[in-house]
């Protein structure tokens, strides 16, 4: 377990560096195509550093805002707070900030950069449809993400992919409507080839970023399932919760493909999609979560 935590920390810094390099290369390609020269290169470096820094410090706030999460204040959330407090004592974690998303679909996610700066959000549908034992299993799963430092890795990836997609879109729009600047020194056959490569990179970069995000491994969810069960010492609780998630037909209205990876199960899949395990290898490779049936079976074998 401790080895996995250390591996996640190393993977986090590696992925941060890779996203930084990709953003930098993207802005340099943008600069080359528009011919801004040395000033543009300096701006590219500044933008890349700012985006990497912003991903690290503000990604949790962005994820919560995009999901329209609000603080879980009020007596109606007392059970929610009590369960998290008990699990945090058992796990040796500080209590994270608790949020709720007004949505009838049962789901939950954790975000933040470390256990001291973490947050957990659940939908109102989860609070209504899960009994105490099932809710405890889901919350233990989310707290395991915090303890294993999965939250930083996932949240940074979500924010960085969004930034890369935005940069690529802006670059292509400038190319389409404005073209290259006049007087650019990049001329001739070599310049044309480099321009072609830069243009292709603007198109391919968002796809590369998505592949990097999915490379953060679906095993992260399996590890959180097992870690959560070790925390509650009651596998049937999480098993029953996952079965309810599998059978529920609702999708989270405030979720998006950018934040899909954060949730305990894909918030955009219908019941039919959750049950479909016969997709092509390419479809399976781009899934953000392991099949719920597989996760349930692993827990039943414990």
Please place each PLM-identified region on the residue numbering:
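Polar-ligand-bearing catalytic/cofactor-coordination segments
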Residues: 1-20, 33, 40-42, 50-194, ...
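Select transmembrane alpha-helical segments in multipass membrane proteins
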Residues: 199-204
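Short, hydrophobic transmembrane alpha-helix segments
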Residues: 25-39
